[in-house]
Amino acid sequence: MSSDPHMLGIQGEQIAAAYLSRHGYRIIQRNYRYRRNEIDIIAKKHATICFIEVKTRASLEKGHPSEAVTPKKQKEIIKAAKSYLFSLGTDRCECRFDVIAILVRSMKQEEIGLYDLDHFTDAFQAE
C-alpha cells in the first residue's frame, strides 16, 4: 500500500470494487463526477442502484475512515447522485447510499492486503 494519500485512496477504491464484485454487486461506474462532486463507485445489486463513498486511512489518528463522510460530504454525494439519475432519464428508482471504510493495518509492501473493511449499507439518506 502507498503512503501517499492520493494513491492510498485509489488503492482503497480498487479494494472496495473487488469486494463489491465478490459480494454480487455489478460495478456500473467509478469516479462519476458532477461539477466538483464525485461518487467513488456506482454499483447495482438486484434492482437497487448503490452510490458508494470509499474512505481509506492508514491509521485511526484522525478517526475511523467512515467519520470522514460528513453531512457536507453526504450532500455533495446526493447532488451527484441526482445528476446521475437525471442523466438516466429517471429520478424514481430504488437506490441507497453506502460507505465503505478501509483501515490499512500495514503499509509494508510485503504485507499488502492487510486491512479492515467495513461496509455500511444505507449509511445515509437523501432528504
From Swiss-Prot:
Coiled-coil stretches, from where to where? Answer: none
Q: Name one GO molecular function term.
A: nucleic acid binding
What Pfam families does the record tag this protein with? UPF0102
Against SUPFAM superfamilies, the record matches this protein to: Restriction endonuclease-like
Q: Which family does it belong to?
A: Belongs to the UPF0102 family.
HAMAP family reported in the protein's UniProt record: UPF0102
Q: Which PANTHER family match?
A: UPF0102 PROTEIN YRAN (PTHR34039:SF1)
Per its record, how is this protein called by name?
Answer: UPF0102 protein Cpha266_0037
User: What lineage is on file?
Assistant: Bacteria, Pseudomonadati, Chlorobiota, Chlorobiia, Chlorobiales
